[in-house]
Amino acid sequence: MRRFELIAPCHFGMESVLKREITDLGYDITEVADGRVTFFGDEEALCRANIFLRTAERILIKIGNFHAETFEELFQGTKSLPWEDYIPKDGKFWVAKAASVKSKLFSPSDIQSIMKKAMVDRLKSQYEISWFPEDGASFPVRVFLMKDEVTVGLDSTGESLHKRGYRKLTAKAPIAENLAASLIMLTPWNGGRILVDPFCGSGTFPIEAAMMAANMAPGRNRSFTAEEWPHIVGKKIWYDTCDEAEEMVDLSVETDIQGYDIDEDMVKIARENARMAGVDKLIHFQRRGVEDLHHPKKYGFIITNPPYGERLQDKSQMPALYRTIGERFRELDSWSMYLITAYEQAEKDIGRKADKNRKIYNGMMKTYYYQFLGPKPPKRREI
């Protein structure tokens, strides 16, 4: 089998969670950098990473890296890479995204254009042809520039891995599925204790939690760009990995996951999304406002993404909303609460300083993941 260096981008601040996921899959980490984790793996690893990783955004095959401070250096560095090892004569190839941080070359469109020209030059000389039909499989390329160091990767995923295939309907500001999974994995929740999302919207937190509880691979019901690359990854490897994912699913698991929302239409959407994900039997959705948040069970988890006044007309309502969250949480005195929000007065209005607070970028928006820790449940006595 071919051996690759694979790059898995993720949300900034979630690198440690992704690193743990990759290690649990059995692969060796080579680098952890801001917003990405790099590891070694073969063709099977590429398939398994795409299908099993919950917190990654995509999986790139690292083509190479080089130093470039000028467009000429960028051109020559790109041209020196072994593109013919990956892209066939009829391949459709382009630089899908270029990102530059603290580098002399900073214009994404110029970087993309020059790299495409360099790729064409390289492939012309290797294949000894002057024109490419580009009517075959797709080979999108992604490039990162950090302090003039250029890292080039071939995107094996296509649409971002957060697109699991179940969320056909959404709330106004839904949280990305892979970010929701990352935030759940930052908690001690493991399926054995109740989990409630009192602002469930389209149901992302409860659905991702249910998929974890049922050991359901997030990529089992979607396609990937690399499925069109039989010269790199054989079809049988994809089939075998999909079979592995199906065999792992356990819908008989006992778990208590609940999602509430004040909007009945959102509750209906959440139920439909859960059905599409195949976990509707594992989640109880209900129309309920946060002021009615209560539960007889002890040692539960609240994991949620409450409103944070992103619209001007909503800002005045935020203090009262977060005070209500704090009041309800104090009544659940054995519970833990985890909430992601961009509302900077959250701790003040909740009435308690968070035990932990992690800054996370949700897209371009700076948010905070407040972690209010409850007591640990007593250990069961051994019989």
Where are these regions (language model features)?
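Short, charged/polar, Gly/Pro-enriched secondary-structure boundary elements
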Residues: 44-51, 159-162, 378-380
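SAM-dependent Rossmann-like transferase core, predominantly class I methyltransferases
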Residues: 152-186
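A short, flexible beta-alpha/helix-coil linker loop
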Residues: 100-103, 160, 307-311
